[in-house]
Amino acid sequence: LRCQVGVPAEERAEPQNLLAHLTLDVADFPTDDEIGQTVDYKTVSDQVRELVGRGERQLIETLAQEIARHVLAEFPVNAIRVELEKFILPETDWVGVVIERKRGERI
């Protein structure tokens, strides 16, 4: 994902790459082998990409929360796990955050 995220303004000045892992607990499993009976992951991906591209954020925690809130509101899932990896610190492979949210939780 390309987005502008970081605490210092210079870090947010240019878009950077994030890696996102989304794990969804789907509400109902399909009875037939039809995409219309479940979550369309392409649509989820497209909407998350569009959401991430809107504006700047200081914290990847905020971004993870926005992603979880959006997916729970727009798709038939009971829960979501969002993991974001950011490749900004030279002495690390990546830094990141993991959140898990359930439908009905206050988020």
Regions found by a protein language model. Name each.
Residues 1-107:
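N-terminal, polar/charged subdomain of small-to-medium soluble alpha/beta proteins
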